[in-house]
From Swiss-Prot:
BP GO terms, sorted: DNA topological change; sporulation resulting in formation of a cellular spore
Family annotation (Pfam families): SASP
Protein's name in the database: Small, acid-soluble spore protein 1
GO MF annotation terms: double-stranded DNA binding
InterPro entries: SASP_alpha/beta-type, SASP_alpha/beta-type_CS, SASP_DNA-binding, SASP_sf_alpha/beta
Organism: Geobacillus stearothermophilus
Family designation: Belongs to the alpha/beta-type SASP family.
Misc. remarks from the entry: SASP are degraded in the first minutes of spore germination and provide amino acids for both new protein synthesis and metabolism.
Segment forming the signal sequence: none
Length: 70
């Protein structure tokens, strides 16, 4: 069953509209890393972008909770 972003992923976003922000973050990070996202891109390159998104989201959440490591 497709989710909001049209994929078949079982991951559900808890905040409406977050998909657009995550997509923007994905393309910004890909640009920083020099990765051209797409079907021809290696799993390793795509994974590096996803991993960086996760790191930044965790860091942001930690800062919001007041216990963030800078």
């Amino acid at each position: 069953m497709p989710n909001q972003s049209g994929s078949n992923s079982s991951n559900q976003l808890l905040v409406p509209g977050a998909a657009q922000v995550i997509d923007q973050m994905k393309f910004e990070i890909a640009s920083e890393f020099g990765v051209n996202l797409g079907a021809e891109t290696t799993s390793r390159a795509n994974g590096s972008v996803g991993g960086e998104i996760t790191k930044r989201l965790v860091s942001f959440a930690q800062q919001q909770m007041g216990g963030g490591v800078q």
